[in-house]
């Protein structure tokens, strides 16, 4: 059977001499599979090592700073071709040479190395303040996507996926070369690529084909089989484990092929403390958490909420707006008896007035009764009209069998963990001032503190100041009120509300977008409120924005009078700086930012 030639044209930037040696090696390997030659007679293992070494030398000579990526792609394509030619043969004709036995393990090593370098390209760019161009980032994301999918089914026939990996890698290399010719790549980005795209270690790749007796490469099948069984990371089976030594390098969130949509980053310095402060001990839960809690239906507690009810939580058909002068409401309740009306009046009279907020529902007169005779004598105050207008626009009535307060909801980490809704304040924080008028308690509008990202001028303010209501005008007590006026609590001075800040407080979606924007700017700016936060006793922001070692490398490169040829051996100072990248303390912080924020839209691919 003749060898497949569809993969020989996908190699990147090879000289004609290397292509000729490659074609001869693939032909001899197919002849070994057909039992026309023996593997020892044509030295398949040694020639495979030499061709992989030629890939690395060619990439170092002409691949510039991203030569490691080119060498990895060429080696991956070479072993994929050997793998595809092996599976096309029958079982009795295949698997009688060292390369055929060790091919799955070598393929696993190459794919793991490709995933490591592409992951590091995205993970460690924010920690070192490296801006990735849009075209290069999009092409690199496609390459990472195809490589990760292949890593889970590497033992099967690669076929089309091999072509997809090589096509994506070729697109990345072409974008890098084009932008390099146009002078659009900075020295910092090129140094970052040289550090990220490392070359595969051939000694580790061919460790399964080294004889335990002589210490050299061998084509003895028995010796290779015995060596594979003793390796800790290799598995001589049809389906090896999905994870390899990369599990100790990559986090669990990056080992998934399907990314989870996260609207707002969670694991940011100071966000957990703010979350605990806002959640509190009682009454602290968002709309989404309360909706999926085990405490019953969500609309039974919506009297305590400030925002409008969600469309997914419809009110009961009987819960409609009822005003004193509404004729439609009185006509709809024509069937109510005098007994029901008296029971409602007695229940309203016996309920405490200064405790939890009551329902805004008024007594509904029967047919023929004059509606609201007490309000006709006194002029309607402007604050009363505002409350009536708010009640008409937002009819919310609690269920009689349910309590009028929102019970605490147990927070479950990782389950529907989002900050879409607005948090409820604590009852003792003075967020609502109640007024009693004619046996009916009216609650003034409350201002609920939304989520503010670390670094926002509102993030370091005390919680009572953020929860304090802004007085809209003088509140006049009614003349006929028998209850004493509530004593106002001393409130902390509220910060000056600018038009931009008031717009952020009113629109939760805009607040979320501003939070994401602020978190993206944390990698480039220093938080100016660090000293103010320590004085106020609020969040202690001891985690400054990440500052990677590439800043030192950039300073060194800019201080040089002549251009540095990165293809030549680097100075000891630069080598020391590059070696310290692996121990960068900002890697974990940048990992959360890169995985939490959607850098590229996955729906486009």
UniProtKB/Swiss-Prot annotation:
<keyword id="KW-1251">Viral latency</keyword>
<feature type="region of interest" description="Disordered">
    <location>
        <begin position="307"/>
        <end position="381"/>
    </location>
</feature>
<dbReference type="GO" id="GO:0006355">
    <property type="term" value="P:regulation of DNA-templated transcription"/>
</dbReference>
<keyword id="KW-1048">Host nucleus</keyword>
<feature type="compositionally biased region" description="Low complexity">
    <location>
        <begin position="321"/>
        <end position="338"/>
    </location>
</feature>
<dbReference type="GO" id="GO:0019046">
    <property type="term" value="P:release from viral latency"/>
</dbReference>
<feature type="compositionally biased region" description="Basic and acidic residues">
    <location>
        <begin position="341"/>
        <end position="353"/>
    </location>
</feature>
<feature type="region of interest" description="Disordered">
    <location>
        <begin position="447"/>
        <end position="509"/>
    </location>
</feature>
<dbReference type="GO" id="GO:0019033">
    <property type="term" value="C:viral tegument"/>
</dbReference>
<comment type="subunit">
    <text>Interacts with human ATF7IP protein, leading to promote and regulate host genes in virus-infected cells. Interacts with RNA polymerase III complex; this interaction downregulates small RNA transcription and 5'-pppRNA production.</text>
</comment>
<comment type="similarity">
    <text>Belongs to the herpesviridae Rta family.</text>
</comment>
<dbReference type="Pfam" id="PF03326">
    <property type="entry name" value="Herpes_TAF50"/>
</dbReference>
<keyword id="KW-0804">Transcription</keyword>
<keyword id="KW-0945">Host-virus interaction</keyword>
<keyword id="KW-1272">Viral reactivation from latency</keyword>
<keyword id="KW-0238">DNA-binding</keyword>
<keyword id="KW-0920">Virion tegument</keyword>
<keyword id="KW-0946">Virion</keyword>
<keyword id="KW-0010">Activator</keyword>
<keyword id="KW-0805">Transcription regulation</keyword>
<comment type="function">
    <text>Immediate-early transcription factor that controls the initiation of viral lytic gene expression and lytic reactivation from latency. Triggers lytic replication, and initiates a cellular senescence program in epithelial cells. Up-regulates human DCR3/TNFRSF6B by directly binding to its receptor. Globally induces a proteasome-dependent loss of SUMOylated proteins in the host cell and the loss of promeylocytic leukemia nuclear bodies. Improves the stability of the triplex capsid protein TRX1 by reducing the ubiquitination level of the latter.</text>
</comment>
<feature type="compositionally biased region" description="Basic residues">
    <location>
        <begin position="355"/>
        <end position="364"/>
    </location>
</feature>
<keyword id="KW-0244">Early protein</keyword>
<dbReference type="InterPro" id="IPR004998">
    <property type="entry name" value="Herpes_TAF50"/>
</dbReference>
<protein>
    <recommendedName>
        <fullName>Replication and transcription activator</fullName>
    </recommendedName>
</protein>
<dbReference type="GO" id="GO:0042025">
    <property type="term" value="C:host cell nucleus"/>
</dbReference>
<dbReference type="GO" id="GO:0003677">
    <property type="term" value="F:DNA binding"/>
</dbReference>
């Amino acid at each position: 059977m003749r060898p497949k030639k569809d993969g020989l044209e996908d190699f990147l930037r090879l000289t004609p001499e290397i292509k000729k040696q490659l074609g001869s090696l693939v032909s001899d390997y197919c002849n070994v599979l057909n039992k026309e030659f023996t593997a020892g007679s044509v030295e398949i293992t040694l020639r495979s090592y030499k061709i992989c070494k030629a890939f690395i030398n060619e990439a170092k000579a002409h691949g510039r700073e991203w030569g490691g990526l080119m060498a990895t792609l060429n080696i991956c394509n070479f072993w994929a071709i050997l793998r595809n030619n092996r599976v096309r043969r029958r079982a009795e004709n295949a698997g009688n040479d060292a390369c055929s036995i060790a091919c799955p393990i070598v393929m696993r090593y190459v794919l793991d190395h490709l995933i490591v370098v592409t992951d590091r390209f995205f993970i460690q760019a924010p920690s070192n303040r490296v801006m990735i161009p849009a075209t290069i980032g999009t092409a690199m994301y496609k390459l990472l996507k195809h490589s990760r999918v292949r890593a889970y089914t590497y033992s099967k026939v690669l076929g089309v996926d091999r072509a997809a990996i090589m096509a994506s890698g070729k697109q990345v290399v072409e974008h890098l070369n084009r932008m390099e010719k146009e002078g659009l790549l900075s020295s910092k980005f090129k140094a970052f690529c040289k550090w990220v795209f490392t070359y595969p270690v051939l000694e580790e790749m061919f460790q399964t084909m080294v004889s335990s007796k002589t210490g050299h490469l061998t084509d003895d099948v028995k010796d290779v089989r015995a060596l594979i069984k003793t390796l800790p990371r290799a598995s001589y089976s049809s389906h090896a484990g999905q994870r390899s030594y990369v599990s100790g390098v990559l986090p669990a969130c990056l080992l998934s092929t399907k990314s989870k949509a996260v609207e707002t980053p969670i694991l940011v310095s100071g966000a957990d403390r703010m979350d605990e402060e806002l959640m509190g001990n009682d009454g602290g839960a968002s709309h989404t958490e309360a909706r999926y809690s085990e405490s019953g239906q969500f609309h039974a507690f919506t009297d305590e909420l400030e925002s409008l009810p969600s469309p997914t939580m419809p009110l009961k058909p009987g819960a409609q707006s009822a005003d004193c002068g509404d004729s439609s409401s009185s006509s709809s309740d024509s069937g109510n008896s005098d007994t029901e009306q008296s029971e409602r009046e007695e229940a309203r009279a016996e309920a405490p007035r200064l405790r939890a907020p009551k329902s805004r529902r008024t007594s509904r007169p029967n047919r023929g009764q004059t509606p609201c005779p007490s309000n006709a004598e006194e002029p309607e105050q402007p604050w009363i009209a505002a409350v009536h207008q708010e009640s008409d626009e937002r009819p919310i009535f609690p269920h009689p069998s349910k309590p009028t307060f929102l019970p605490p909801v147990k927070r479950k980490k990782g389950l529907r963990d989002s900050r879409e809704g607005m948090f409820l304040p604590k009852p003792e924080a003075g967020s609502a001032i109640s007024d009693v008028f004619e046996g009916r308690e009216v609650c003034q509008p409350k201002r609920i503190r939304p989520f503010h990202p670390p670094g926002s001028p509102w993030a370091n303010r005390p919680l009572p100041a953020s929860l304090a209501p802004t007085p809209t005008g003088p509140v006049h007590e009614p003349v006929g009120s028998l209850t004493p006026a509530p004593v106002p609590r001393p409130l902390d001075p509220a910060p000056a509300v600018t038009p931009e800040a008031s717009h952020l407080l009113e629109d939760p979606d805009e607040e979320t977008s501003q939070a994401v924007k602020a978190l993206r700017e944390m990698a480039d700016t220093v938080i100016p409120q660090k000293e103010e936060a320590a004085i106020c006793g609020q969040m202690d922001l001891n985690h400054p924005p990440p500052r990677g070692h590439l800043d030192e490398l950039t300073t060194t490169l800019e201080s040089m009078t002549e251009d540095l040829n990165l293809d030549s051996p680097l100075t000891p100072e630069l080598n020391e700086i590059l070696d310290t990248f692996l121990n960068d303390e900002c890697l974990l912080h940048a990992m959360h930012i890169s995985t939490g924020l959607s850098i590229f839209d996955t729906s486009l691919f």
